[in-house]
Curated annotation (Swiss-Prot):
Pfam families named in the record: SNO
Annotated residues for binding of L-glutamine: G46, E47, S48, R106, I134, R135
Protein name: Pyridoxal 5'-phosphate synthase subunit PdxT
Keywords: Glutamine amidotransferase, Hydrolase, Lyase, Pyridoxal phosphate
UniProt organism field: Pseudothermotoga lettingae (strain ATCC BAA-301 / DSM 14385 / NBRC 107922 / TMO)
EC number from the UniProt entry: 4.3.3.6, 3.5.1.2
Catalytic reaction list: aldehydo-D-ribose 5-phosphate + D-glyceraldehyde 3-phosphate + L-glutamine = pyridoxal 5'-phosphate + L-glutamate + phosphate + 3 H2O + H(+); L-glutamine + H2O = L-glutamate + NH4(+)
Active site, UniProt feature: C78, H170, E172
Signal peptide: none
């Protein structure tokens, strides 16, 4: 079973590396045809406005809308989380897919030079996880159907809603593959047990 990584812009190569290390068949998704070959999709960090525009231009956004109705698994990191959100408070006119019942604030954890790493307690992945935050979005509201898997302070930074997963941080930039494994298990994709 193939997992796609949206390759329109952003750090998609790092996600490919993580999936390949887990011995999962992967494809870079740049077209609707690419997307149709997958059993799940990762939307990487990058520039959410650019990724959103390109997803609409290529038809990928429309195709994702159909797939989400069929419980298609999607994981969004950083910019990917912004695109999954139903609303972006500090950029109300920015396009998002709106699949998750979360409201986010872009760049809420600071600018690029204010990036940081922190250990998060994530029981569903086996405890402490070193999370890397780079111009990260903050979840400021979330619906009842959204499960909070990890928090930084009082704010959720890893959430799940059905077959949708989103994180403010970048697990693809570290060596710990447990978040990717969690997503693969959500998607029903077998992987190597490497951490």
């Amino acid at each position: 079973m193939t997992i796609g990584v949206l390759g329109l812009q952003g750090d998609f190569r790092e996600h490919l590396w993580a999936l390949q290390k887990l011995q999962v068949e992967t494809i870079v998704v740049k077209t609707v045809e690419d997307l149709r070959k997958t059993k799940g999709l990762i939307i990487p960090g990058g520039e959410s406005t650019t990724i959103g525009k390109l997803a609409r231009l290529t038809g990928i956004a429309d195709e994702l809308e159909k797939l989400v109705d069929q419980d298609f698994p999607i994981y969004g990191t950083c910019a990917g989380m912004i695109l999954l959100a139903k609303q972006i408070v500090n950029y109300p006119y920015q396009y998002s897919f709106g699949f998750m019942d979360i409201v986010v604030e872009r760049n809420a954890y600071g600018r690029q030079v204010e990036s940081f790493e922190v250990n998060l307690d994530i029981p569903s992945t086996g405890g402490l996880f070193k999370a890397i935050f780079i111009r990260a979005p903050k979840i400021v509201e979330w619906g009842e159907g959204v499960e909070v898997l990890a928090r930084y302070g009082d704010s959720p930074v890893l959430v799940r809603q059905g077959n949708l997963l989103a994180s403010s941080f970048h697990p693809e930039l570290g060596q710990d593959l447990r978040i990717h494994k969690y997503f693969l298990e959500m998607a029903g994709v077998k992987h190597a047990g490497i951490c």
